[in-house]
Amino acid sequence: MRIDKFLQSVGLVKRRVLATDMCNVGAVWLNGSCAKPSKEVKTGDVISLHYLKGIEEYTILQIPTLKNVPRKDTHLYIAPKTKE
């Protein structure tokens, strides 16, 4: 699944266009490198979202098969990465 579609599906961003724009300006990183919107994600990858307020990191637990994941089920697909 494309990273822009994944971000929208699990609810990290509201719209896919916003996810695409974030990737294009370098606000989305995948496994430590800047990700283009078409980059494919897989289980175990680490996504870093660079916001003005700071950086949020998530580990991908599984790839959703639904178009949009219900908010109550988000924890099945992503987990916040703990600070070491």
Curated annotation (Swiss-Prot):
InterPro entries: RqcP, S4_RNA-bd, S4_RNA-bd_sf. It comes from the Bacteria. PROSITE patterns: S4. The keyword rRNA-binding applies. Residues 1-64 form the S4 RNA-binding domain. GO terms for molecular function: rRNA binding; tRNA binding. Associates with stalled 50S ribosomal subunits. Binds to RqcH, 23S rRNA and the P-site tRNA. Does not require RqcH for association with 50S subunits. Key component of the ribosome quality control system (RQC), a ribosome-associated complex that mediates the extraction of incompletely synthesized nascent chains from stalled ribosomes and their subsequent degradation. RqcH recruits Ala-charged tRNA, and with RqcP directs the elongation of stalled nascent chains on 50S ribosomal subunits, leading to non-templated C-terminal alanine extensions (Ala tail). The Ala tail promotes nascent chain degradation. RqcP is associated with the translocation-like movement of the peptidyl-tRNA from the A-site into the P-site. Belongs to the RqcP family. This is RQC P-site tRNA stabilizing factor. It comes from Helicobacter pylori (strain J99 / ATCC 700824). The gene is rqcP.
